[in-house]
Amino acid sequence: MNPIVKSFEYGQHTVTLETGVIARQADAAVLASMGDTTVLVTVVGKKVADLSRDFFPLTVNYQEKTYAAGKIPGGFFKREGRPSEDETLIARLIDRPIRPLFPNGFKNEVQVIITVVSVDPQIEPDIVSMIGTSAALAISGIPFSGPLGAARVGYINDEYVLNPTVDQLATSSLNLVVAGTKAAVLMVESEAKALAEEIMLGAVTYGHDQQQVVVDAIAEFKAEAGKPTWDWTAPVQDQALVAKIKELAEAGMTEAYQIEVKQDRYVQVGIVKAAAKAALVAENPDVDTREVDNLLGSLEKSVVRGRIISGKPRIDGREPDMIRALSVLAGVLPRTHGSSLFTRGETQALVTCTLGTERDAQKIDSIMGERTNRFMLHYNFPPYSVGETGMVGSPKRREIGHGKLAWRGMNAVMPSAEEFPYSIRVVSEITESNGSSSMASVCGTSLALMDAGVPIKTSVAGIAMGLVKEGDDFVVLSDILGDEDHLGDMDFKVAGTRDGITALQMDIKIEGITKEIMDIALQQAYGARVHILNVMDQAIGTHRGDISAHAPRITTIKINPEKIRDVIGKGGAVIRALTEETGTTIELDDNGTVKIASSNGEATKEAIRRIEEITAEVEVGRIYNGKVIRIVDFGAFVNILPGKDGLVHISQISDERVANVSDHLEMNQEVAVKVMEVDRQGRVRLSIKEAQAKETAE
């Protein structure tokens, strides 16, 4: 074995790429390290293309092994199972920038597997995974227009920080990941605390500039370790067939794409395509129908893009910067804690908000450590939203990714646990879709949270921008349709407040997207965002003054931390009885904070009363109403508070001489007693006669 190793400094870490030792039967395998975080990236491609497919079959699998963090998996089977949400999101993060770098027409199946085998708790594995993937593809011989670089950018004390540690990210107002080639930015994923557009654009530029060291290092690594490039050539188009299809379908396609209603437009486009295909088959029964379908798709793209770039109205008749008609409703469902219906053109989201207690929070145990997520946002995309049938079940990668993007958009304005001690779950049901459903989810979430009485800092709106670029000419599109996303060159999603950006996601399919274009897109997005916020604020401009009557009300009290064990009781008996008998949910913190949750106010009051009794300190000189629980020769023991008993000595029962305690007291008798003393050992001395004397005096 002859290892080939390339190391370079990258920000505050050393990155090492190694090949030639592990997984040598794969087309390429790279062991990539950043500090002590190490991933094994393998690439395998099939040498024979599957021409029956009309798409590029690329699969990216990212898997975190618990042994990487020195842990044993939980659960019965004690082994890793289905991908977690974090693993799914990182797989998408890797997939998005590499997919455009494979050549058009390449249909060979390619699988990339990234396995995290060692993890430093201060260095997240996503950036080194992207770098390792780029290196593995570069040396594999598979046609790939890399290398690709990747960087994480933080913003701390008004300065950009390259690849910040986990601790640094905790104090950063920005968490941005950017990936690109030597010449172009291809992908951006970020979360921010309402930062200005120029700061966000500066972070993208900074990250792309800094990652050039990665691109150069991988190029050198490829020169030493790269395999010969596959002998692959792009399929040659039959120009006569291209011309014939244009003759048969261009006019009909142009007319169809002036129909504003999506489903009607799709029907007409289908008719035009079917007629053209039928005419071609009638003329030549041996024509390759798959190639015909591909060329019809290319013509469709050319028609739509040509109209936009020439200054003609968009598919639905809008100008480039126009937003579709908005309909905003809050409080649309009677029993949910909060709800909204947000409609933008033919995209619609029904969003609900549910409030719960701290125990309802999501507990996540990953290789980066344990964490608790109080705010959850789930996005569902049922097939009926686009007029189709399909499988319904567990969320797909796209649904997980869109939900996380909407979560990032809202996270900056969420209240702290001290401000609002609830767990919050938002669900966005996409009931109609024609572009930008994730940004509709952001708008709907903001409305539903306000309807639920969640004190978010301000409203948040989201907008999806697009781009059509031909040569030096380009048009930036606001509020793109699904077709404009599919047929355009850029998908640029921006969420934020009036003050700044909270989330930015960008996927670029071509090179040549300049800083000028991105700046125009950001400024145009700002105008669109403010317009949407104005409409949203007319429906509900601030959070409700109170939470729903159907939501649990959380009341917080403080007790002496030393009394926590008294509230819990032996084996949890006391707190179990409290929750069962009052119908409340009770949570205890080590610092003495007690949270009582119930939708019934009287039940909450009863629980508080009983907790206060349990934790109350016995006061010397105070008179208590107690119950006799034990009689002995020298006196009686009386319970004055839950778990608090005291002794009434025989001499303290009456002013008269008492010969037999049982002649004066009996079991379970209620008596008034005065606390005379609490000694150092906590023993309580009580007096009945002193209590009677005080009552007589009063």
Swiss-Prot record:
Could you tell me the Gene Ontology terms of the biological process aspect for this record?
A: mRNA catabolic process; RNA processing
What Gene3D superfamilies does the record point to? GHMP Kinase, N-terminal domain, K Homology domain, type 1, Nucleic acid-binding proteins
Keywords, alphabetical: Cytoplasm, Magnesium, Metal-binding, Nucleotidyltransferase, RNA-binding, Transferase
Required co-factors: Mg(2+)
Q: Which Pfam families match?
A: KH_1 (PF00013), PNPase (PF03726), RNase_PH (PF01138), RNase_PH_C (PF03725), S1 (PF00575)
Q: Name one GO molecular function term.
A: RNA binding
Residues that, per the record, bind Mg(2+): D485, D491
Cellular component GO terms, alphabetical: cytosol
Cysteines paired by S-S bonds? none
Q: InterPro entries in the record, alphabetically? A: ExoRNase_PH_dom1, ExoRNase_PH_dom2, ExoRNase_PH_dom2_sf, KH_dom, KH_dom_type_1, KH_dom_type_1_sf, NA-bd_OB-fold, PNPase
Major location category of this protein: cytoplasm
Every copy of the S1 motif domain together lies at 621-689
Record bears the keyword RNA-binding: yes
Which residues are in the KH domain? 552-611
Q: Where in the cell?
A: Cytoplasm
Describe its assembly. Component of the RNA degradosome, which is a multiprotein complex involved in RNA processing and mRNA degradation.
> What biological function has been recorded for the protein in this entry?
Involved in mRNA degradation. Catalyzes the phosphorolysis of single-stranded polyribonucleotides processively in the 3'- to 5'-direction.
Q: Which family does it belong to?
A: Belongs to the polyribonucleotide nucleotidyltransferase family.
The protein's name in its UniProt record: Polyribonucleotide nucleotidyltransferase
Record organism: Shewanella frigidimarina (strain NCIMB 400)
What gene is behind this protein? pnp
